[in-house]
Amino acid sequence: MGSRGGSGGDGAESHGYAADIHSIREAQARIAPYVHKTPVLSSTSIDAIVGKQLFFKCECFQKAGAFKIRGASNSIFALDDDEASKGVVTHSSGNHAAAVALAAKLRGIPAYIVIPRNAPACKVDNVKRYGGHIIWSDVSIESRESVAKRVQEETGAILVHPFNNKNTISGQGTVSLELLEEVPEIDTIIVPISGGGLISGVALAAKAINPSIRILAAEPKGADDSAQSKAAGKIITLPSTNTIADGLRAFLGDLTWPVVRDLVDDIIVVDDNAIVDAMKMCYEMLKVAVEPSGAIGLAAALSDEFKQSSAWHESSKIGIIVSGGNVDLGVLWESLYKR
């Protein structure tokens, strides 16, 4: 783990970031009718294993099964009627796709969803369930973006970016507001990182409320571009990714990178075996089924890297963002059986 970054609450509002505490509070008011205020769970058994008090913000119980509905609904309900009339388009491997489809359905407008051919079946089914118009792409981010651009040009639909967008970031940040409203004494939050929309929103909100709070990212070893970016001081992309955490394969955007660079204190990298072990622990001790991307925060809290760091010694009450629960049960049981 590297040195702490970031300058706290004032910096979170004054350095020209895409979002701030004000846009996040506006998002909270805007999306309140359309999202769940998800529960915060705890387990004395898990606390004993980790050696700290953990508070799990369970976005696996969110509408569409993940935190993504926060950013999607904020983006879609922020559109004026003329902008919304031609619908919205996005590209996503799963959770954001379903969230956009659902938010568009709630707004009564069409949603064009570009999905890579390797997306998990359970997540594709969610998009269909919410009435999204699916357009397939190849698996690369370049293909996804190219197809989304073509659909946008053909339909006039507004792009709802999965992470690199002010309204998306602001919507995701509302999860941090809820967590700290319920457990204000939290001193560290561990957040999954991929494109950076969630952790950017969490960091901007949390550090505005409590400048001394620590924000840690959790990232899979097979898709550790954020850790490499943090070390290099610039955005690093990878030629390919290989991880069970299918929701954590995107790379940082130009709007999320400055927040990650400045306000994320450290990035903990864990392997897929650790993620599966954390999924099992969530199921056995929290009685909650979570997807790999949602379990990675617990995996990070259990890691030797964290326990050997100053962050572990300086933390007592740790928030864990359980980002989603859209897991293919067949994959879940196969993974748990192998462990």
UniProtKB/Swiss-Prot annotation:
Binding annotation for pyridoxal 5'-phosphate = 95, 195-197, 323
Residues holding ATP:
43, 63, 130, 287, 326
How this protein's activity responds to pH is stated as: Optimum pH is 9.5 for racemization and 9.0 for hydration.
- CDD domains assigned to the protein according to its UniProt record, in alphabetical order: Thr-dehyd (cd01562)
Tell me the residues on which S-nitrosocysteine occurs. Answer: 122
Where, by residue number, does Ca(2+) 1 bind?
90
Q: Where on this chain does Mg(2+) 1 bind?
A: 187
Q: Name one GO biological process term.
A: L-serine metabolic process
Q: What is its EC number?
A: 5.1.1.18, 4.3.1.18, 4.3.1.17
Indicate which residues the UniProt annotation says bind Ca(2+) 2: 219, 223, 225
Name the positions where Mg(2+) 2 binds. 219, 223, 225
Q: What's known about how it's activated or inhibited? A: Inhibited by semicarbazide, hydroxylamine, aminooxyacetate, sodium borate or phenylhydrazine. Racemase activity is enhanced by Ca(2+), Mg(2+) and is decreased by ATP, Cu(2+), Zn(2+). Hydratase activity is enhanced by ATP and is decreased by Ca(2+), Mg(2+), Co(2+), Cu(2+), Ni(2+), Zn(2+).
| Annotated positions binding Mn(2+) | 219, 223, 225
Could you tell me what reaction this enzyme catalyses? L-serine = D-serine; L-serine = pyruvate + NH4(+); D-serine = pyruvate + NH4(+)
Catalytic residues as annotated in Swiss-Prot or TrEMBL: 68, 93
Instruction: Mark the residues carrying the PTM N6-(pyridoxal phosphate)lysine.
Output: 68
Query: What job does this protein perform?
Result: Catalyzes the synthesis of D-serine from L-serine. Has dehydratase activity towards both L-serine and D-serine.
Q: What does the annotation say about its assembly with partners?
A: Homodimer.
Regarding protein family, the annotation reads: Belongs to the serine/threonine dehydratase family.
User: What protein is this chain from?
Assistant: Serine racemase
